[in-house]
């Protein structure tokens, strides 16, 4: 059953047999910048681990006309204390994308990864995948979603701005960032800058911790996730 639709894609739960296609998608999206030895690279084994550990949090976007997987998003659950900085590198939080730190009793969703094929970017695919994430957060009565946003355009400003200055400029709209700006428009807010967040030249390794509050969160109600019962 499809979770959500837009004019371009159908978003459905990820499956074990999609793993090889998703590994290929990652290689295309990152255009060789994440080779096999790269610490942030996701392989078929990682996607199988994600589906096995937390199937509810994994989604793919499929072109209904061709059957091609054109995007995906991965998430896990964890505990987070609001108001505290979030500074963990991506590889630590996610165990290199395997999701073994996933906590079924976690009250926050953590955004592990989201990627869309270049030919499908700008067509609402990313928004459809985020909509699936937000819907799941509301279904599970989570407090919200936290993630690290790789600041993809920082390399263009590294000689002029510190990471904190750059993120502040993105937040105020003075600078456009290919990643963070889009997430701010989806309702996220910035918590802090994360040094050594990822191994990435474009961001110089920096990320911004971002948070989305679930407007439907009801603290008097438990999460309905079966594994959290």
Task: Kindly give the residue locations of the regions a language model identified.
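A short beta-loop-alpha structural element at the N-terminal edge
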Residues: 7-24
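Aromatic/hydrophobic pocket-lining residues that form π-stacking "cages" and hydrophobic walls in ligand
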Residues: 22, 133, 179
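Hydrophobic alpha-helical core bundles mediating ligand binding, dimerization, or RNAP-core interactions
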Residues: 23-30, 47, 130, 137
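Active-site rim helix/loop that mediates acceptor-substrate recognition in acyltransferases
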Residues: 29, 34-65, 69-80, 91-100
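Short hydrophobic/aromatic beta-strand or adjacent loop that forms the aromatic wall/cage
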Residues: 56, 204-209
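Conserved acyl-donor/pantetheine-binding loop and adjacent beta-alpha core of acyl/acetyltransferases
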Residues: 73-113, 131, 151-178, 184, ...
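Conserved acetyl-CoA-binding loop-helix of GNAT-fold acetyltransferases
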Residues: 116, 122-137, 144-147
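Short, cationic low-complexity segments
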Residues: 224-229
